[in-house]
């Protein structure tokens, strides 16, 4: 009889100690800061882990840390809940990222046993992280297999463009390998999308849910890759009108129901634009003439090299330029 009493008591003590340790760690985080602590088994101490922030069409590096005794950490001030991305350029890592949410005063713990980022466990008291984890869990088996293939592809790209840069024969061999890998990754991605879209039918409409719908809506133009257009439209119908009026909601609407393409003789869309001399111009000034509108992306390396104005424009106007 005593055996059956002692075991529950021991379990209760262990749980209390675990909760106490977590509370102690959180208590050490000031109200205006966040703390990420990671512990990775089976990885060498030379590996560099990067923390990035998604700023529209570019990932900006926030901090780096080198693995020491299997551990890494990031700490900084933060005023609002936001999503960060963890990546590594080291060999064997997939060319993708792990979504990690941070918030004021929050402690975030990451644990992993390999280089396959999406398989790492992220634990915190942040609601958005809990929802992010539920999305990942939808198709964990497929995620793990996909990470393995992406790691192989990323290693081939590194060999092609760094280790064997300029070697056309090796590049030809590399692209053949990558093409064969992508034949495996495309159906895996589609399986993951299908499972996540299925989950979204019943999931709460959260910030994570909106981010996912925006991602899938943006992919609808690639019909051969993204075969779930009707599912995306159905999920859009779930969105409250208040969400549809937000910036993200309007962007989703434009992807799902794109504006009509202008034809010859149609009225031009006009607006205030500035030329290289910082003079105010209007497209209507060129009525009756052919106009070439060249759209540049500040997040593209070749664009930044070709157009040096792109970088200061983005730096000086971070909110206006995505």
Feature locations, PLM:
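Bacterial N-terminal signal peptides that target proteins for export
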Residues: 1-8
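C-terminal motif of bacterial Sec signal peptides marking the signal peptidase cleavage site
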Residues: 17-20
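A non-transmembrane, solvent-exposed segment enriched in polar/low-complexity residues
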Residues: 22-187, 191-194
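Short coil/turn connectors between adjacent alpha-helices in alpha-solenoid helical repeat scaffolds
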Residues: 180-184, 220-229
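Amphipathic alpha-helical repeat scaffolds of TPR domains
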Residues: 204-220, 250
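N-proximal helix/coil linker or "cap" segments that precede and/or mark the start of modular domains
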Residues: 227-274, 284-286, 315
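Short active-site neighborhood of thiol/selenol oxidoreductases, capturing the structured segment around
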Residues: 279-304, 310
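Conserved helix-turn-beta segment immediately C-terminal to the redox Cys motif
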Residues: 305-322
